[in-house]
Swiss-Prot record:
Subunit structure, as described in the record: Homotetramer. Forms heterodimers with either ThiH or ThiS.
Organism: Acidithiobacillus ferrooxidans (strain ATCC 23270 / DSM 14882 / CIP 104768 / NCIMB 8455)
GO biological process, alphabetically ordered: thiamine diphosphate biosynthetic process
Gene3D superfamilies referenced in this protein's UniProt entry, alphabetically: Aldolase class I
The organism's place on the tree of life at top rank: Bacteria
Stated name of the protein: Thiazole synthase
Length: 260
């Protein structure tokens, strides 16, 4: 395959699959799934995982060395801009991380983002020098606003977090992609490899997922499937699919037939 890196905040990555670290039975399974997925960027919820905050609990970084993986701290569990900003500041103190995934939840049932709180947090974080990858609704206006204000990537949801419903509104995603000036990565809602392939076929720069792997009957096998789905979808996008037609079009030649 041609050289086709994912570029975020000026850094190149060969994998377009970003993965989370929650819901696995232990850190060993987490690492095995990440390796099977081929992921280079691994997102971690600072409010739920130990990255050095506690000396008495296992440290995830012992399984995910920083020289091999890009750790992407996220603000999962935050419901206000203030909490999200505080969490990102903690990430910078713990590991000098400035690339962060911002999410500010507005509703505990749907886990949809609170866009006002997210905007306020993004504004503060960007001003403080953070490189913000922002979780958003699949609203073209909101996604464009986040890009214009300086977010290094915009991550619209495909469906509610952990739902596994797949891409519910490909048409909004197409509009978001048409006007994109920063990488667009689907975040949340994918359930299986075909969902990932569709996202990449549409032109998304990548996909971030967690539950689709961790909640599978065989997480390691599903991680492999997700990696292959990303690769197939990206290749199909670069190749350019045939146009859709209402009527049939024979693939065999119609002239020079034997019985003519």
């Amino acid at each position: 395959m041609r050289k086709d890196p994912l570029v975020i905040a000026g850094r190149e990555y060969q994998s377009r699959l970003l993965v989370g670290t929650g819901k696995y039975k232990d850190f060993a399974e987490t690492r095995a799934a990440i390796d099977a997925a081929g992921a280079e960027i691994v997102t971690v919820a600072l409010r739920r995982m130990n990255l050095g905050q506690s000396k008495d609990a296992p440290n995830l970084l012992e399984f995910l060395p920083a020289d091999r993986f890009t750790i992407l701290p996220n603000t999962a569990g935050c419901y206000t801009a203030e909490d999200a900003v505080r969490t990102c500041r903690l990430a910078r103190e713990l590991g000098d991380w400035k690339l962060v995934k911002l999410e500010v939840i507005g509703d505990p049932q749907t886990l949809y983002p609170d866009m006002r709180q997210t905007y306020d947090a993004a504004k503060t974080l960007i001003a403080e020098g953070f490189e913000v990858m922002v979780y958003s609704v699949d609203d073209p206006v909101a996604c464009k606003t986040f890009a214009e204000m300086g977010c290094v990537a915009v991550m619209p949801l495909a469906a509610p977090i952990g739902s596994g419903l797949g891409i519910r509104n490909p048409y909004n995603l197409r509009i978001i992609l048409e006007q994109a000036t920063v990488p667009i990565l689907v975040d949340a809602g994918v359930g299986t490899a075909s969902d990932v392939a569709v996202a990449l076929e549409l032109g998304c720069d990548g996909v971030l997922l967690n539950t689709a792997i961790a909640a599978a009957k065989d997480p390691i096998l599903m991680a492999e499937a997700m990696r292959q789905g990303v690769e197939a979808g990206r290749k199909a996008f670069l190749a350019g699919r045939m146009p859709r037609k209402l009527y049939a079009s024979a693939s065999s030649p119609v002239d020079g037939l034997f019985f003519e």
